[in-house]
Amino acid sequence: MLNSLKGLLSRKNDVPSPTVISLGQVWVDIMMDIDAIPQPGGFAVANHTMPSVGGSFRVMQAASRIGAATKHAGVIGNGPWASLIRKALNDNGIEHIGQDRIDADSGFRLVLNDSERKTFVATYGAESQGNENTFDCVEPGEGDVVHISANTLMDHSASGIDAFLHRTSSDPTTRGDDSAGACSTTACTLVPDRP
């Protein structure tokens, strides 16, 4: 009986596993723990500083950890922040299929944490410099999940999202069995009506 159950569990499933494809932006968060946000012109010393890869990376990392094939179709730059991003993607088994910018580094966010709230200061980089062709490399297969983050809808990369949705058809009766999901955050309130 045990061998029979083991045989059933070890059979390969004929249904292909879905791939998670993120069209989201990835950047580096530099977390700085401080006692208090300084007044304009003031000064603060960070008690702890920790760089980590952020943005859509966390969604991809979670998908990869549960065993889904995971791909990042966003733009990555060239420089120290981009190197940190590429290492994190590689370490987590996430394939980068998107464009590479050799003329700009990826961006970063300073995250000032005073234990009551977080204050963000962003500098955008290569991840925000897409265009209408940015996601031409993305061809979702049957059952694939496409992740779209609100941040990608806030800059030039939005035209790439628009072109992708028109190319792959947003009508589920003609699109097939792939799925698209948008990340719901407060950034959605900043998204313009059209790219």
Where do the protein language model's features map onto the residues?
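Ser/Thr-centric signal marking residues that sit
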Residues: 70, 106, 119
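Beta-strand->loop->alpha-helix junctions that form or flank phosphate-binding loops
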Residues: 73-78, 97-106
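Ribokinase/PfkB-type carbohydrate-kinase core domain
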Residues: 1-26, 86-101, 114-195
